[in-house]
């Protein structure tokens, strides 16, 4: 959760940062060190702060005068600041000017680039999809283009982040991208003028079934998020929406005011949404209520969360769960209940600094424990039983094993029991009991399909390379799968680009010719043929209709979404139960 703060203004941290960065940019550390010493002896400062500054001054001078090699002062400065912040919590972080500018761009939901989604595969970074109407779309970049150079620099060994940083830049300035395209005899060059690229936080909104709307708020919480949700709900109601699935999975959070506004669109006016407590001038508890919307519609609502649902999205899920407004389905959320402010440093660098903690309407702390100091434990191992596994490339795709709850026999939905409650219990007005201190626990737990197994990770990889050739008309006998133009905004019929037995056999042959490269055999594909079909279907639909259509293909077989749809009658019963308790 991030809020804005234009200037830094907090105690000795600011003083040390300003003095150290000033010393380095001044270029004369010993003279600057004497100035620091004068400041550190200022009797108006507390003794503890004077001691800290004195020790810092001594260490700085000793390094400057005695280190055996040249000193990278900028690197030393950045490491010093980050080291200090890392002792506080996992979310207080230092940013260089370039990274800080990028962070602020992300929260303004706009950046200057070309409009492509990219991903690092085994041998290079490739274009996964192109955003309709952007400079990249107009220039002719396509799904599957292999990025070879950016502005004359060899990019074949770059990470996706390196390519992204190089492609982004000043609005109106060109960037030259050299690509290799399946079926092309020679590399192609594109000079593309950078422009603003919209980054909507509502990534999908459509009627998934008659009367049932699906809205994916998965792109964070930026300055326009509340407006996007309001528009999506209005559009869905015009199309006959009577019940809703709100998808908050993989939403990393963002701006606190936007989280409050989004939650307010589902709650009666005056309802509390979140309380915030700080240590200094914010030490008093601030309770934020719905003051803008009459969001008391009583249509059934199911909210999807997973382990990557964090911060602002947990505020929304927690408020809806506390008030009984929505049924939560999925996995226990990330557990980030700390509020950061953005602080700008004198030379354009910046900080995100934790200044407050937030709590659900009934007082639950969402923040997970981070006292071990291990960032691996905090970000990867959500509980001690977790084992490390390869990162899943995309969302789960196939129905999983039976769910842990069968709501057909539970007319009054209850939260999933937590075996080891991390915080104190709270009881809502409707008599439901929840525990704080460990994220938002779903009412119905549904595990995603394990797509991170070694075999499935390889199927994902080879499916992309196969479809890259398929969409270019390079697979013998399947030339009719060639994609000449992307039909954005359309959803394919089941008969469009079907993954038939013939396609699957071509896939096996593609693997058979290059087993050494992909590390998978046709027999392994046969053992997981349904997953292979789904991966190919996702890729070819993405190539032909864009990433939104590809995502819908995956959602059609998403076990968590399928359970959410199945649970809508239980969401209706929950709403009726809460209304009855409020009336009594």
What are these regions (language model features)?
Residues 64-128, 172-204, 274, 558-565, ...:
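Extended, small/polar residue-biased N-terminal targeting/export presequences
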Residues 26-36:
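Hydrophobic single-pass membrane-insertion segments
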Residues 1-10:
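N-terminal positive-inside, membrane-proximal cytosolic segments immediately preceding the first
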Residues 60-69, 81-93, 108, 122-123, ...:
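Sec-exported extracytoplasmic/periplasmic mature domains
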Residues 365-366, 370-584:
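Conserved functional hotspot residues or short segments at active or partner-binding sites
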Residues 35-44, 57-66, 211-212, 542-548:
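Acidic/histidine-rich, surface-exposed loop or edge segments in extracytoplasmic proteins
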Residues 12-26:
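Hydrophobic membrane-insertion alpha-helices, especially the h-region
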């Amino acid at each position: 959760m991030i809020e804005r703060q234009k200037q830094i203004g907090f105690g000795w941290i600011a003083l040390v940062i300003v003095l150290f960065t000033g010393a380095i940019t001044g270029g004369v550390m010993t003279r600057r060190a004497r100035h620091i010493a004068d400041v550190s002896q200022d009797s108006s400062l507390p003794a503890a702060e004077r001691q800290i500054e004195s020790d810092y001054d001594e260490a700085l001078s000793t390094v400057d005068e005695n280190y055996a090699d040249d000193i990278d002062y900028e690197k030393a400065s950045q490491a010093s600041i980050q080291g200090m912040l890392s002792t506080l919590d996992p979310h207080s972080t230092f940013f260089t000017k370039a990274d800080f500018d990028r962070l602020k761009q992300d929260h303004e939901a706009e950046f200057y680039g070309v409009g492509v989604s990219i991903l690092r595969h085994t041998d290079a970074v490739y274009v996964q999809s192109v955003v309709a109407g952007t400079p990249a779309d107009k220039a002719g970049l396509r799904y599957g283009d292999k990025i070879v150079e950016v502005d004359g620099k060899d990019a074949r060994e770059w990470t996706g982040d390196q390519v992204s940083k190089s492609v982004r830049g000043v609005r109106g300035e060109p960037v030259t991208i050299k690509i290799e395209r399946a079926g092309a005899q020679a590399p192609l060059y594109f000079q593309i003028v950078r422009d603003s690229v919209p980054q909507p936080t509502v990534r999908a909104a459509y009627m998934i079934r008659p009367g049932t709307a699906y809205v994916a708020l998965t792109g964070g919480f930026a300055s326009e998020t509340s407006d996007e949700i309001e528009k999506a709900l209005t559009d869905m109601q015009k199309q006959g929406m009577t019940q809703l699935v709100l998808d908050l999975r993989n939403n990393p959070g963002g701006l606190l005011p936007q989280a409050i506004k989004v939650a307010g669109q589902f709650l009666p006016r005056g309802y509390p949404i979140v309380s915030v407590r700080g240590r200094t001038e914010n030490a008093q508890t601030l309770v934020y209520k719905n003051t803008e919307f009459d969001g008391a519609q009583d249509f059934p609502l199911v909210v999807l969360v997973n382990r990557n649902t964090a911060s602002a999205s947990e505020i929304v899920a927690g408020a809806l769960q506390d008030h009984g407004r929505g049924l939560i389905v999925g996995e226990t959320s990330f557990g980030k209940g700390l509020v950061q402010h953005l602080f700008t440093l004198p030379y354009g660098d910046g900080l995100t600094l934790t200044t407050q903690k937030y709590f659900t309407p009934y007082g639950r702390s969402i923040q997970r424990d981070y006292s071990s100091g291990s960032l691996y434990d905090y970000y990867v191992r959500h509980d001690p039983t977790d084992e490390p596994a390869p990162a899943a490339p995309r969302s789960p795709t196939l129905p999983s094993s039976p769910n842990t709850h069968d709501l057909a026999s539970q007319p009054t939905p209850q939260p999933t029991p937590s075996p080891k409650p991390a915080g104190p219990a709270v009881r809502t007005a409707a008599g439901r009991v929840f525990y704080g201190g460990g994220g938002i626990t779903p009412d119905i737990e549904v595990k995603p399909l394990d797509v991170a197994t070694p075999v499935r990770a390889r199927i994902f990889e080879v499916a992309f390379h196969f479809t890259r050739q398929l969409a270019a008309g390079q697979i013998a006998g399947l030339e009719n799968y060639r994609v000449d133009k992307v039909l954005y905004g359309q959803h394919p019929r089941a008969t469009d680009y079907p993954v038939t037995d013939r396609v699957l056999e071509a896939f096996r042959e593609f693997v058979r010719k290059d087993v050494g490269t992909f590390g998978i055999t046709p027999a392994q594909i046969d053992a997981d043929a349904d997953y292979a079909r789904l991966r190919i279907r996702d890729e070819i639909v993405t190539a032909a209709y864009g990433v939104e259509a590809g995502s819908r293909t995956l959602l059609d077989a998403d076990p968590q979404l399928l359970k959410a749809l199945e649970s809508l009658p239980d969401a209706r019963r929950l709403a009726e139960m809460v209304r009855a308790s409020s009336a009594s």
